[in-house]
Amino acid sequence: MSAQTSLAAQPASPVLPNIPVRPPTATPPPVPASTAAPAVPRLYGPPGWTVRIGLWRLLEPWLDTPRCLPGEAPLRLDALGAPVSDYVPFRGMDAATAADLLSRLPAAALSDRQNLAPSLKTMLTACAGADGQVRLCGYGIGPQREDERLSVEALWVADADLQGYEVLVEHSRDCQCSALWERVRDRYELDAGCIPDDIVRTRPEWAGGTVGWWMWWD
């Protein structure tokens, strides 16, 4: 067999289609939209911020046991250090605790106020600088709620030069509640929106029976 015959007998090479080669795209595929519900914004910080700053341990010496719910211990914490109850009342907070809280609380939380009461910052500042003559009462709201916070709703003032005022239950013309409040407000630079809803002379056990004025905002 000749070389010509042998070459002719071989099958022809297949013709490949002319497919252009394209570089891989640099744009990633779209990310599917999340079906999870968006996080609900909190009042003063992410959930658990009160636990992280140690709020509940600071409040423990001042728990208002009579205001606890029936059958509840004054303070029960879960494994994360948060209170089991979402409402933790306290009374008689002293100057050292107030000063500690001023250094720990975030700025936004210090702006909290009980309706028209003074801001938390001015209340804590008054207490911290009064060497026991000003005490605070209020409550903490736990991480279970979106309004997790510390609130002060009342202060107790024992300055000796303020004890001569006369406050009457019926707030008649002779009642000196407005004059008393103005002295307290100006002395301690309190930024309240109105006079306290209640002003009562008391001798609380957490102040050792010392006489003082209890001023409360609804």
What is the predicted role of each segment?
Residues 183-218:
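Acidic, proline/glycine-rich low-complexity IDRs
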Residues 2-173:
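Long, contiguous N-terminal structural blocks used for assembly/anchoring
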Residues 167-188:
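Short amphipathic alpha-helices in soluble, non-transmembrane regions
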Residues 42, 55, 174, 199, ...:
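Intrinsically disordered, low-complexity regions enriched in Ser/Pro/Gly/Gln/His and often acidic
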